[in-house]
Amino acid sequence: MAIQVFNSLTRKKEPFVPLEEGKVKMYVCGPTVYNYIHIGNARPPIVYDMIRRYLKYRGYEVLFVSNFTDVDDKIIRVANELGEDVFAVANRFIEAYKQDTSALGVLEADHHPRVTETMSEIISFIRVLEEKGYAYEQGGDVYFRTRKFKEYGKLSAQSIDDLLSGARIEVDERKEDPLDFVLWKAAKEGEVSWDSPWGKGRPGWHIECSAMVKKYLGDTIDIHAGGQDLKFPHHENEIAQSECMTGKPMANYWLHNGFINLDNEKMSKSLGNVVLANEMIRQHSAEVLRFFMLSAHYRSPINFSDELLEGAKRGLERLQTAVSSLVHRLQESADFGGTEPWLERIDEFRGRFIEEMDDDFNSANGIAVLFDLAKEANRYLREEQTSKAVLQSFIDLFNELGGVLGVTLNRQEELLDEEIERLIEERNEARKAKNFQRADDIRDQLKAEGIILEDTPQGVRWKRGS
């Protein structure tokens, strides 16, 4: 059965059929780099990395492009506030973004284009729109004639006549129509600018992605993705620009991930209710944050709380402990016959995982299958005799499916001393709070990793087992 994808354009699930058999062209709108990312910003790279990994797992060759907006009003404002060069600010936050997303297990894009490196393509794109009558110049600014594109509003399901003037699009008396949006901004004194047929200036936000999609992926792509907040006006405007320029559909499938809310309100820098990703990585680990994100369906909103994050941490540790137990049992097991029923049962979990993930990349249900696999593994570990072949089959499947999600479940490498000390301290705190179940869980986790604890009057001592 084909993968089913919820297409924001048609507002329904559809079988995924790429333009070219076996190949997928995918574009994800990247960050405007003027600050460190918060966990809401971290969700798109994580979920679309998961989707990219799953498509590759299902045999597709994926060409993945994600951009950096490295010149923008916000970047200029921050640079002015700090008294720094615009490009220095952008470069600093690009590097910070790369560090955070790498820690979160996000694979490098095949192409990471920057606006400042795509200027000639952006200018050429606008020139074509102007020649076709879809764009006009006013005092060095260039605008898009929104009403001229008869399908405007098809992604966000809005009639052009129902759109409120200036509600989401900046009102400007130089526009022919209040709904027209800017393609090129005339230079302001002291701001960074580029030469163009309309004088010095810089591009508007929406045209940048249209130009980069065309440059790296062509006129029509398979998947265009981003946060739910980008659906209108950003993605709507991208469609208008690109389809008027090429005369072809921009993308066949549009994917949008849900928000992360804090106290039931969307997390956003403008609201000041953000939790920085690097802070969460330091406090809880990048792997826990990624697992937390993937424990919900990518289109569903997540109401963030420390309790939910702690639950994700316990869930991930349960899976890792199950795998560690399998790995340690391997050393004392032998090969013998009659294991086919177990091997067949293990293989069924692969089929279940694929079935869940084929349904619009449902990582939450995929993780539920992993928990069922862990239960089955623990049941097998209670057998009097355990077969190396069966144990290895369990381990291999955990590695395989964990890899699809970008989560390491087999922690065969030794825990670092600092991690051991942190877990022992957490166990001490749990015992003080009379949370003996958590204390026992930590002892079991350390035991599975070959760490032996000894409670003494002077405190807890530990050593690595042989």
Curated annotation (Swiss-Prot):
Its main location: cytoplasm. Its cofactor is Zn(2+). It catalyses: tRNA(Cys) + L-cysteine + ATP = L-cysteinyl-tRNA(Cys) + AMP + diphosphate. Keywords: Aminoacyl-tRNA synthetase, ATP-binding, Cytoplasm, Ligase, Metal-binding, Nucleotide-binding, Phosphoprotein, Protein biosynthesis, Zinc. Belongs to the class-I aminoacyl-tRNA synthetase family. GO terms for cellular component: cytosol. It comes from Halalkalibacterium halodurans (strain ATCC BAA-125 / DSM 18197 / FERM 7344 / JCM 9153 / C-125). This is Cysteine--tRNA ligase. A motif ('HIGH' region) lies at residues 31-41. One of its GO terms (biological process) is cysteinyl-tRNA aminoacylation. One of its GO terms (molecular function) is ATP binding. The keyword Ligase applies. It is found in: Cytoplasm. It is an enzyme of class 6 (ligase). A motif ('KMSKS' region) lies at residues 266-270. The keyword Cytoplasm applies. Its EC number is 6.1.1.16. Gene3D superfamilies: Cysteine-tRNA ligase, C-terminal anti-codon recognition domain, HUPs. It comes from the Bacteria. ATP binds at residue 269. InterPro entries: Cys-tRNA-ligase (IPR015803), Cys-tRNA-synt_Ia_DALR (IPR015273), Cys-tRNA/MSH_ligase (IPR024909), CysS_C (IPR056411), Rossmann-like_a/b/a_fold (IPR014729), tRNA-synt_1_cat_dom (IPR032678), tRNAsynth_Ia_anticodon-bd (IPR009080).
